[in-house]
Amino acid sequence: MFKLCVFVALLSLAAAAPAPAPAPGLIAPGLVAPGIWGPTVVGSPLVAPQVVSVVPGAISHAAITQVHPSPLLIKSVHGLGPVVIG
């Protein structure tokens, strides 16, 4: 029971922690377009690599961050709705 309480406490702390802000020079300005599940942000092209974050609209807790050299536009992921990229 004690292990369960510790696990729940650590899980609550991890869920409440704010996401780290990316470096200002890594994010490109983007174009915001309306979508069914919310706005879709399309990153603009840059010479330097930029941070690409993919967040399905229907799953708010899922986020994948990676460095990608070119902008991407993804309208949906297996029917889950639009994603935010930029």
Curated annotation (Swiss-Prot):
Residues 1-16 form the signal peptide. One of its GO terms (biological process) is neuropeptide signaling pathway. Keywords: Amidation, Neuropeptide, Secreted, Signal. It comes from Drosophila yakuba. Residues 17-50, 63-75 form a propeptide. It is found in: Secreted. GO terms for cellular component: extracellular region. The modification Isoleucine amide is found at residue 85. This is Neuropeptide-like 3. The keyword Translocase does not apply. The gene is Nplp3. The keyword Signal applies.
